[in-house]
């Protein structure tokens, strides 16, 4: 994995670029974004061997289409509560938002999201009175930990963050940077 940073002054397009990659913005013009799924013949005796094959175009696909070709996207938007989490919902319900499509039938499994919420709370040291507290009542740093924790828990192949640590205290920023570096070590592409 690797971490790719996109630099520029606020308003120069970083947010729109990430939203376009995620399939949330239409693309008017520009190049191609290709996904090359790993093939068994690429690794011989631990050495990377380039394989000449066509990639899968991501531009113009919505998030479900992108997922169907094997790209597991995780997106941490700039607007934590407007686009990332539902402020009036608690941690378990916000965890469920990422996984509800994987459910079978009309009934939702409420145990798995509650377990994940507890895991995120414990591992990322989210300060909250209880798991049932609406996330809008948490500090900005704790909201960011909940959001990043949920996205990382989805085991993404591509993790995109818009302003990952904007407005956060130094300790929370350090925690978020460590999480991003851990993902890189696991082979995740971080933008």
What are the functions of these language-model segments?
Residues 1-191:
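Glycine-rich phosphate-binding loops of nucleotide-dependent enzymes
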């Amino acid at each position: 994995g690797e971490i790719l940073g996109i630099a520029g002054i606020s308003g120069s397009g970083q947010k729109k670029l990430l939203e376009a990659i995620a399939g949330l913005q239409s693309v008017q013009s520009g190049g191609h974004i290709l996904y090359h799924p790993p093939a068994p013949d690429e690794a011989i005796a631990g050495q990377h061997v380039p394989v000449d094959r066509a990639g899968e175009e991501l531009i113009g696909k919505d998030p479900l289409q992108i997922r169907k070709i094997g790209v597991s996207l995780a997106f941490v938007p700039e607007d934590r509560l407007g686009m990332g989490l539902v402020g009036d919902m608690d941690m378990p319900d916000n965890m469920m938002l990422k996984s509800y499509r994987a459910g079978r039938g009309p009934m939702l499994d409420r145990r798995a999201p509650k377990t994940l919420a507890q895991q995120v709370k414990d591992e990322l040291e989210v300060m909250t009175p209880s798991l049932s507290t609406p996330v809008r009542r948490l500090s900005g740093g704790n909201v960011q930990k909940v959001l990043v924790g949920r996205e990382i828990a989805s085991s993404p192949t591509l993790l995109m963050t818009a302003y990952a640590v904007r407005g956060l205290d130094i300790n929370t920023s350090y925690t978020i940077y460590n999480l991003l570096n851990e993902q890189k070590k696991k082979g995740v592409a971080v933008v």
